[in-house]
Swiss-Prot record:
Organism: Staphylococcus carnosus (strain TM300)
Protein name: Large ribosomal subunit protein uL24
Keyword annotations from UniProtKB, A to Z: Ribonucleoprotein, Ribosomal protein, RNA-binding, rRNA-binding
Pfam families assigned to the protein according to its UniProt record, in alphabetical order: KOW (PF00467), ribosomal_L24 (PF17136)
Gene Ontology terms for molecular function: rRNA binding; structural constituent of ribosome
Gene3D superfamilies (alphabetical): 2.30.30.30
Keyword Nuclease: no
Record text on subunit structure and interactions: Part of the 50S ribosomal subunit.
Family: Belongs to the universal ribosomal protein uL24 family.
Function: One of two assembly initiator proteins, it binds directly to the 5'-end of the 23S rRNA, where it nucleates assembly of the 50S subunit. One of the proteins that surrounds the polypeptide exit tunnel on the outside of the subunit.
HAMAP family reported in the protein's UniProt record: Ribosomal_uL24_B
GO cellular component: ribonucleoprotein complex; ribosome
Gene Ontology BP term (one): translation
Keyword check for RNA-binding: yes
Amino acid sequence: MHIKKGDNVIVISGKDKGKTGVVQSTEPKKDRVVVEGVNIIKKHQKPTQFNPEGGILETEAPIHVSNVQLLDPKTNEPTRVGYKFVDGKKIRIAKKSGEEIKSNN
């Protein structure tokens, strides 16, 4: 998966198109990512011993990785991800600017 935890991404399709956020978690087996402030759902919570009031909680739901695109660290525009070997290590680069992509995690 070309998106990692801590990356800045923009949503390119769906109900939250155009929103940007930081990737909070990834689910590689399902090809899904959870982005901060994107795809907010309301979850109805029954009262429990720990939360006696229950109620409606708002939380982020995972979205498919094909619906998000990485933001170029140099130009802050959507870009594709490329890979390059430097000193025997594989690093991610932004296709638009050639800048190295570093995660914020």
